[in-house]
Amino acid sequence: MVMMFIGIDDTDSPNKYCTTYIATLLIEELKGCGYSVDMPKLIRMNPMVKYKTRGNGGVAIHILDELYSKDKEEIKNITISLVEKYTDFECENTNPGIVFLDEAKYKENREKLTNYYKKVLYDIVSVDYAEKFILKVGGEFIKYKLGRGIIGALGAISSTPPYTYELLAYRKKEMWGKKREIDEKSVIEMDKETFPYTFDNYDYENEKILIAPNTPCPVLFGIRGIDAEILLKAMHKIEGEKPERFMIFKTNHGTDVHLRKMNIKDIYPNTGVIVYGRVVEEPRDIEGGHVIFKLSDGTGEIDCMAYEPTKGFRDIIRKLIVGDYIAVYGTVREKPLGINIEKIKILKLEKKFVKDKRCPYCGGTLKAKGKKAGYKCKKCKKTIAYDEIKMIEVERDLKTGFYEVPGSARRHLSKPIQLIDLI
């Protein structure tokens, strides 16, 4: 007799369903059949994967009972039935996969599975690679269409701490596709009452609710936090449309597990990095409302970009100057190669000097006569040579520490500043 894991991924689409909904229904049915089930996991993989259906997240379920062969067959049949019923097969980009792995094989291959988890966080993994790996660790898989879902299904099974939690509340079927009615004031109150133990509930800068998805899927809202008990209390504070059911998932949301420290010379596209270096080109605005600057760490240089959707965060980036020593957290785009910034940590600020535009004779205002041609005082009319102008230090409108994008622009995996010392 053995215990087992089930992994599922890539069943949803931008228009229909949600893999977590299948997991929730599956757990309900398994419990109804008398099986014991651990808290399910919702695990996000590399956010730079281009063919993801929505958030590139797989789910994993751990059956805690000792199972006979007939039990395993029953569980597999229930799983397959639900996946086939609640998958959007019509969507070209939806390619479901299911993985089954006995707990004995899981324990025997724990180190290999940990390495696989890191790989799906940092790199782009092929279906062929996942197939071979599943067979290598003694698992089984079922592919539909291209079967990309087996990649994330095994990734969810393989995941390791750190974890956070997400409570997902689901809508009644007759409400699917209709506008979600969630009271904004209640979300704000819930956020303030549960801070810092819940996160990404509301974007105060852009006055936007963050707990509700924008797609016509079964999810009514999702509340993220670091304490499952607090999530239960938070759910009851939300006013508006009432959910039909809910489930708490163990997740890797808000953990920064997709990022790793790298030297610029070693950086490659479609991975997540933390890079320490100095600003070597001052930030500038480019087409589209984005802000870009260049960073050097002694091994190379790389462009770092704050995109337009990061809104006010771009104003922080604009205040950086050449010489500032910072850490940049983000993912690497392919063309042109550069870092999409998720947050920065300012470690040391360069002193900033400007020309003293006051007349040294009378204190009046100086006016430039031309490029490096000197200055003339508007008040006493005296002329001052260009190289006679004093440089004075001005206070920087920045402090050392972390600065982050607003919640509405944050990736699932990115750690909010409020969690830096909590997880």
From Swiss-Prot:
Disulfide bonds: none annotated. SUPFAM superfamilies: Nucleic acid-binding proteins. One of its GO terms (biological process) is tRNA wobble cytosine modification. Transmembrane segments: none annotated. Its EC number is 6.3.4.22. Its main location: cytoplasm. Keywords: ATP-binding, Cytoplasm, Ligase, Nucleotide-binding, tRNA processing. It catalyses: cytidine(34) in tRNA(Ile2) + agmatine + ATP + H2O = 2-agmatinylcytidine(34) in tRNA(Ile2) + AMP + 2 phosphate + 2 H(+). It is found in: Cytoplasm. InterPro entries: NA-bd_OB-fold, NA-bd_OB_tRNA, TiaS-like_TCKD, TiaS_FLD, tRNA_Ile2__agm2C_synt, Zn_ribbon_TiaS. One of its GO terms (cellular component) is cytoplasm. Pfam families: TiaS_FLD, TiaS_TCKD, tRNA_anti-codon, Zn_ribbon_TiaS. Residues 273-347 bind DNA. It is an enzyme of class 6 (ligase). Belongs to the TiaS family. ATP-dependent agmatine transferase that catalyzes the formation of 2-agmatinylcytidine (agm2C) at the wobble position (C34) of tRNA(Ile2), converting the codon specificity from AUG to AUA. PANTHER family: TRNA(ILE2) 2-AGMATINYLCYTIDINE SYNTHETASE TIAS. This is tRNA(Ile2) 2-agmatinylcytidine synthetase TiaS. It comes from Methanocaldococcus jannaschii (strain ATCC 43067 / DSM 2661 / JAL-1 / JCM 10045 / NBRC 100440) (Methanococcus jannaschii). The gene is tiaS.
